[in-house]
Amino acid sequence: MSSTKTPISLTIKLNQFTDKPTGLDINPYHNSPIMWRNIIKQLSSRTPQKLLFSSKNRTYSFLGFGQDSIFKDNTKFRSLIPISCSNIVMGFQNLGEYLPGDEFLSRPLIKNQVNNNFCCRKSYASVAEAVAVSSTDAEEDVSVVDEVHELLTELKKEEKKQFAFRRRKQRMLTSGMGHRKYQTLKRRQVKVETEAWEQAAKEYKELLFDMCEQKLAPNLPYVKSLFLGWFEPLRDKIAEEQELCSQGKSKAAYAKYFYQLPADMMAVITMHKLMGLLMTGGDHGTARVVQAALVIGDAIEQEVRIHNFLEKTKKQKAEKDKQKEDGEHVTQEQEKLRKKVTNLMKKQKLRAVGQIVRRQDDSKPWGQDARAKVGSRLIDLLLQTAYIQPPANQLAVDPPDIRPAFVHSVRTVAKETKSASRRYGIIQCDELVFKGLERTARHMVIPYMPMLVPPVKWTGYDKGGHLYLPSYVMRTHGARQQREAVKRASRNQLQPVFEALDTLGNTKWRINKRVLSVVDRIWAGGGRLADLVDRDDAPLPEEPDTEDEALRTKWRWKVKSVKKENRERHSQRCDIELKLAVARKMKDEESFFYPHNVDFRGRAYPMHPHLNHLGSDICRGVLEFAEGRPLGESGLRWLKIHLANLFAGGVEKLSLEGRIGFTENHMDDIFDSSDKPLEGRRWWLNAEDPFQCLAVCINLSEAVRSSSPETSVSHIPVHQDGSCNGLQHYAALGRDKLGAAAVNLVAGEKPADVYSGIAARVLDIMKRDAQRDPAEFPDAVRARVLVNQVDRKLVKQTVMTSVYGVTYIGARDQIKRRLKERGAIADDSELFGAACYAAKVTLTALGEMFEAARSIMTWLGECAKIIASENEPVRWTTPLGLPVVQPYRKIGRHLIKTSLQILTLQRETEKVMVKRQRTAFPPNFIHSLDGSHMMMTAVACRRAGLNFAGVHDSYWTHACDVDKLNRILREKFVELYEAPILEKLLESFQTSYPTLLFPPLPERGDFDMRDVLESPYFFN
């Protein structure tokens, strides 16, 4: 064997569909692979091998060639993947990818100026070179077996990188956008995520300049002028405080955190975050100090991290020439890293910036105390500098009425069960600011907007979602054990969950402009239509001109009631403004995306909080799929069914053919609604979901009026909803025939209505009780009163919440509210007694119809009680591998002193809440199962080429694909419950707590799960 040790790089061609490499290409110009077994042969052989290079027959070692190489001097060896496949560097990710650990900093690139390929010098740039380092001569005392293992290991690494690369490229292709368009949108997305606060601060500074130069302030919207008036004095106060802190003159505990961000950005964040809390809080323009301080402090810390990183690398660049010789390498690598981040908004290397910054930033998280102190100080400074002046409507000689915009006060709330009271600090805005809050949304910085490009694929607890904004795969709400459980889980274990979230996040949406224009017209006209709140407050009743205390007491109660209603209206108006602000901002985008994450039970949610498909009718009405698909004959049928479902009012309980008939009988109304939504007969306003109904009216009208309705394109998401889905899961767990029939797990001519079924049972029991002697059975009188009040509406809420473990007291209060609404029983004591009796009968009827569900619910609760009694939280793993830890622990209190007040921070203790662990486990376990079913369906739909969106127990796709969706969701439900779910749960409990004794599994019925496949109304 030749002793020449000049290494060559071998191009490894990987097959994305197999686990084995297809061959090794050592020809720099052609793909003429040597089969894998031949390479192994060469490795295993101790004799020289002859390899053929471009028809030249020479003798080479496996990893070298003679000094008279056949390759030209200027030859640069090829990268791992051919040029046509968007090369990645040997051992490197493609542009925009992230290399873990020190690998990121350790590989300088050499670029071939001819073919734009890259190779790595002084690193294991290829499998061949990696093996070459360990053995290039048959005489060395290294095992050939070790060489083979090393080769296999390196191949596996490269294959994983290539597979990830191909998946990402495929995602880009399936997103329906070319490379150039994708990069343009990506740059915009990064600006949205990284420059929002900076741009807001810049805008205020420019407005201040314009105001001074051109007197433009009077032309600003009222709320914008308020923000502008507060910005400069707040910024200056912050700057003064920062100077004291940076010079060491401030002894405050927050001092070392306070000067890490420019004063203008801190001012903007403080104003916007506080106003956001005042808008979204439901308490009449107030926010709790502790909540506001933590929210503001957290936002400041997030901005500080990236700011510190960029500033640190700037300084390192400036000091490069002063570095000692042994530190030059570090400086060079830091400079390379800085360039990667600073080019973030211009180039492709965006995906990993969050991880880069976190890895390079060696500063520890601030902690809750520091965030609270920084936030409190900023609120304190805003209180000192923010003033408001009513519009000028007084004589010039009068002094201006200038008053603080915000007031800090303490609120005392009496506890229900104790004589003691609870006190907490609040920030309350002036009435003028309060009235302006509803118009503030369009001027607010709204983080976590829908994305312009597909979200980053999830690969870990904090790796995925947004390109740059902090994103976490689970909403743990500070539950440490839950967070640690997810972090400990392997990527392989969580891959099914990651894949499902990626599927949901890759669904493309757009704004339905026609529906949005109707919403805007109604809102501009004062609301009051289509369930939109009245934009005006209800007038307060006039004070009676009398000394009669009874009349005055009645008046005071009316005033209190009207004020409560006005507070609710205000909250709803703010909510609508936020939704419309997002819709208006996104209406001209061709498409956008919602990154998703899960709650601790495994239910998926969009990360954007305001305008999303989990929201109200107005959200769902203005959102539609960005991709349109021809209806086809099946799609036209399902669009008609969908319209009937949205109209509701009992229509949704008809058979599918009955619903189609309803729609066809109202085609004139549908045309009128589409053509003249506000000027015509307004039939669509009678629907239970009016804006969604209007959207379907428009689409259906276009299709029916076209020359070929089947080829008409539809963007409408058509829903398939479960029938009391929680009870469906219980019936499947218990193989309960009676329960399965009640919730449509078996086929029927029309959908079974579980609420009507329970109401019928309740009525039978009450009729029987009404015949009894009141002297022996006191409830007989109540039964006689209630017989005429029993219907599905009376029992619906109790049946719905039964899956959540509703208690007798909860059921009593629910039924009492329904009876009070009807005014059937005037006397309060009689009303209470009737509600008690009705609740008892309703729960009895539920137990009879869903006996298996009750027994499973009881078993789950008993297991949870046994575990929690050992001071352990209940843990389980969902069918998709997500670890769940119930977060219910007793809360401890921690006092910290801030510049504003003493704050009480809540912290988890080590003591679990036994009762809460027990009562919450059954519904949480069922939610983890419905989340698993939705995720399984989502992934299967993607693989079948369907667009999919999900809202827990409501699955959406294009009208033309509903039949495919129905088949898939039924198959996945059967697949889910063919697994021994309860057996595995019990086994996991026994393994985790071997010293505890758990009750045996409840008996189950003989319902055949495969009957679900033939049930048309299981989801419909």
UniProtKB/Swiss-Prot annotation:
Keywords for the protein's UniProt record, in alphabetical order: Chloroplast, DNA-directed RNA polymerase, Mitochondrion, Nucleotidyltransferase, Plastid, Transcription, Transferase, Transit peptide
Biological process according to GO: mitochondrial transcription
Top-rank taxon: Eukaryota
Region feature (Disordered): 314-336
Tissue: The highest levels of expression are detected in the mature leaves. The level of expression is lowest in the cotyledons.
EC numbers for this chain: 2.7.7.6
Subcellular location: Plastid, Chloroplast; Mitochondrion
GO cellular component, one term: mitochondrion
Active-site residues, Swiss-Prot/TrEMBL: 721, 796, 953
InterPro entries: DNA-dir_RNA_pol_helix_hairp_sf, DNA-dir_Rpol_C_phage-type, DNA-dir_Rpol_phage-type, DNA/RNA_pol_sf, RNA_POL_N_sf, RPOL_N
Its job: DNA-dependent RNA polymerase catalyzes the transcription of DNA into RNA using the four ribonucleoside triphosphates as substrates.
The protein's name in its UniProt record: DNA-directed RNA polymerase 2, chloroplastic/mitochondrial
Upper classification of the organism: Eukaryota, Viridiplantae, Streptophyta, Embryophyta, Tracheophyta
